[in-house]
Amino acid sequence: MRKSALLLALLLGASAADAQLPFLRKRDNQPQQPVLQGIDALRADFAAQAGGTTVYYGAESVILGAPARAALTLQANWLRKHPEVVVRIEGYGDGLDTRDHALAVGARRAEEARSYLLLLGVPAAQVSTSSWGKERPGLGRAVTVLVR
């Protein structure tokens, strides 16, 4: 009889503890969303809040058009809110150029984008530039702003 009473007390105590401590209950096996950490989270937030990371130019152009300025304005707004983040603007040629011409066009595009971000109040130390010639022709007529 004592064993039965003891067993009953243990079972009741366990169920009461489960009711009082809901975090001990077994949860449904629902898939959990992966939590982005650190730089990956910043990159994802930048892309989502700034409307993407790529800014396009016209063929053989280094002048920022209205869509490019609008995209860079969104990026500048995000960067001003995150002064701890450093970005690199990578410029690209048009893909049909010679290597040297593609590097020069990419550098001018990257510098134009950087200058516009600085004009909008992004600190100079927060933005660097680089250029790709024929090494990365896939993103011709564009600059890409990369969170580092």
Write out the residue ranges for each language-model feature.
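Sec-dependent signal peptide recognition
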Residues: 2-7
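Residues within well-formed alpha-helices
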Residues: 18, 67, 74, 109-112, ...
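Periplasmic peptidoglycan-binding/tethering modules of Gram-negative envelope proteins
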Residues: 20-86
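Generic anion/oxyanion-binding catalytic loop in active/binding sites
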Residues: 8, 61, 99
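Periplasmic OmpA-like peptidoglycan-binding domain that tethers envelope proteins to the cell wall
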Residues: 92-148
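Hydrophobic h-region of N-terminal signal peptides that target proteins for export
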Residues: 9-18
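Amphipathic, hydrophobic secondary-structure cores in small proteins
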Residues: 88-90
